[in-house]
Amino acid sequence: PLVGVTPTPAGHPYTGSPWNYTDILGIDYGDVAANPDATKPYPPDVVDWVFVSVRQGDSLASSTIFRCVGLIHTNGLITIECPCFRSAGTDKYYILVEHRSHLPVMSHVTKLNGGTSLSYDFTTSNSWKLGTPIPQEVGQKHKGAYWVMYGGNGDQQYNSSSGFDLNSIDFDVWTDDNGNVFKYLKGDYDMNLDCNSLDDDFWINNNGRINFIPR
């Protein structure tokens, strides 16, 4: 989904931990000249893959009823690669969006629109927070007129005591990738195919932030 100066991966990057999503949805996307599994190029306005989950009834991970990969576009729209789920129109839902190098975000309670569709705009207000007294706890970052995800989180492992956090391990991810160009890397935090000091700035600006979305 990145700039077309190098072959981009065919399929999504969420097969490993902590997602362990083994469905091969999206394997047909990619650079058709370089990836034998790819049969069609990414749409020109696609930025990257995200991982989307829906929780029904409450915000606990055990309430997850739907998991799927999606493509995020330059305007922020996410298109899902799975068929829609079926459920009761009167229940409440939480939508979780994860990206391989950002802190995850989860919606506040939302319901089906007209009993038929589920949507949520994360750009208009801060996302779900547990509400601890810890000052470093965050949902999203207010940037200009929009609320956005916190970048610089290259290590996605969940810690039961600290939740998802930006720390020195994320700096290590950048350190390992620093100096590489034209590659699809976790440490390329601004996703311009050039892992350099500007990516380190993402980590520096967001280091220490935590969120406690139940895993």
Go through each PLM region and give its residues.
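Short amphipathic, basic-aromatic surface patches that mediate peripheral association
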Residues: 1-43
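Short Pro-Gly-centered beta-turn/loop motif in secreted/extracellular proteins
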Residues: 44, 78-93, 100-101
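Beta-strand signatures of extracellular beta-sandwich domains
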Residues: 49-55, 94-96
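Glycine-centered loop-to-beta-strand initiation motif
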Residues: 52, 72-83, 199
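Acidic glycine-/aspartate-rich tracts in secreted/extracellular proteins
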Residues: 56-60, 100-103, 178-180, 207-209
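Short, acidic Ser/Thr/Gly-rich low-complexity loop/linker segments typical of extracellular
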Residues: 58-77
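Short acidic/polar inter-strand loop motif in beta-rich domains
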Residues: 99-112
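Alpha-helical segments with a strong preference for the paired helices of cellulosomal dockerin domains
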Residues: 139, 146, 156-183, 192-215
